[in-house]
Amino acid sequence: MSASDRRRLADQPLDFTITAEERLADGFRPLDRLFVSHASLDGTQRFEGVRREVLRAREAAIILPYDPNTDEIVIIRQFRIGAALKTPNAAALELPAGLLDGDEKPAVAAVRELREETGLEALATAPIFSVLTSPGLCDEVAHYFMCIVDTRGLPLVAGLADEHEDICLLYTSPSPRDS
């Protein structure tokens, strides 16, 4: 991909102003109502008094644990309220993940969350990418990391009791296998 294509396909700055802000709900993810004014994408006009609700969130670290000795990745299954409300499958499959604490760096959070949710230690950690998870709904930024791990001798369940985590660990190959 050319540098021009990378710029064209990247998020872009846009002139905007928050003209009013109201807290609608506190909690794990506070909900705010904002009134904003912003320039149109082509710069020919300005939209005024646009109402938007946004969930406020801390940044998150999401981990892809990979064991090169077994060519397996670790995924987890746990109860998720969003899955329970939208599907018959409340025990959702996902990658280990968690929120950054205070001014914690994303890579440090990735190593900590990997240990808390799987019992695994990161032998090496590399950033993959960062993304806004759902920019029309919330301000959460998720930082993805690859962590090299050794899965030998690990239990099939993990999680922190004080965070009400009941996590099942699953191991699977990222490569297609013959049936």
Language-model features: where?
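Alpha-helical and coiled-coil interaction segments, frequently adjacent to or embedded
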Residues: 2-16, 20, 25-28
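Conserved Nudix-box catalytic region and its N-terminal flanking loop in Nudix hydrolases
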Residues: 2-7, 52-57, 64, 69-112, ...
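Acidic, metal-coordinating catalytic segment for phosphate/diphosphate chemistry
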Residues: 26-69
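A generic structural signal for well-ordered coil/turn residues at beta-strand boundaries
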Residues: 30, 59, 89, 138-141, ...
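Active-site-adjacent beta-strand/loop module that shapes the phosphate/pyrophosphate-binding cleft
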Residues: 30, 36-41, 134-155
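Hydrophobic pocket-lining residues within nucleotide cofactor-binding pockets
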Residues: 68, 100, 122, 149-150, ...
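A contiguous pocket-lining binding segment that forms or flanks enzyme active sites
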Residues: 104-147
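Conserved small/polar residues in nucleotide/adenosyl-binding loops
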Residues: 171-178
